[in-house]
């Protein structure tokens, strides 16, 4: 894809719509004991998990527009540490920052969602198309996969992000699961998430109120989420800047003086796409592409059993 759309912030590649000041503020933030973080590599079920957590915290009354959602569940890297001061609590902070590029706490709670690298790559490709200017002519999937396996995409290498979190998957303050598990049994995992957040307050409440449980499941359906998250980055930047003064984030003011690029972009997928398992089969259609991925995966995971997470979904053998 187009490396002009990447910005290096202290060794971390990020999308050029992020501002270095806010990324650094997120990196340096010292977590509070009541903080809940949703940590993922991009396009691994981030928004879905955020919305589930929001609905659990609000007893099924999560925001139905992106602006209110971002105030309640801030994209930390984008909005900066200032977002923690205006966020209603309980709330959840979403971050794509790698494990070793942010301050960790043994008392805050972390939800990490992993997705198989093939489907992640496909979803990431379609998402980044929407952030690639039309002046970039080569937007083929083949070109993207070369950048993906080289770590020349926002937030760097997939496994460099996943493996440190995988090593912490059994920590008592970490809930680690896969997108595929969430997709296959959403009901069970919503309950596990609720128990992790607070079994008495949220988990037991869902067990005792089937109507509430179903309300949350319906709200977090793919169809409903497409309606809620149907706008682009420029829209939610402008809407955050238009908040009343008492709710406005100082960290977002940088977008007034350093606004987003107005270049016309290729058509991308937005924040919510197909939500399918196995769409990779429609994209990795050549032996060259499959071998490139297999070689990369074998090299990156030679000292880890992490690929066992997806032993049951018929990925290419490794």
Question: What is the meaning of each model-derived region?
Answer:
Residues 140, 178, 185, 209, ...:
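Helix N-cap and loop-to-helix transition residues
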Residues 199-218, 225, 303-306:
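Short, surface-exposed acidic
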Residues 47, 51, 163, 184-191, ...:
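Amphipathic alpha-helical interface elements that mediate macromolecular binding in regulatory proteins
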Residues 1-177, 197, 202-203, 256-318:
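PAPS-dependent sulfotransferase catalytic domain
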Residues 39, 170-196, 227, 231, ...:
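Phosphate-binding beta-loop-alpha motif at adenosine-nucleotide cofactor sites
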Residues 212-294:
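PAPS-dependent sulfotransferase catalytic core
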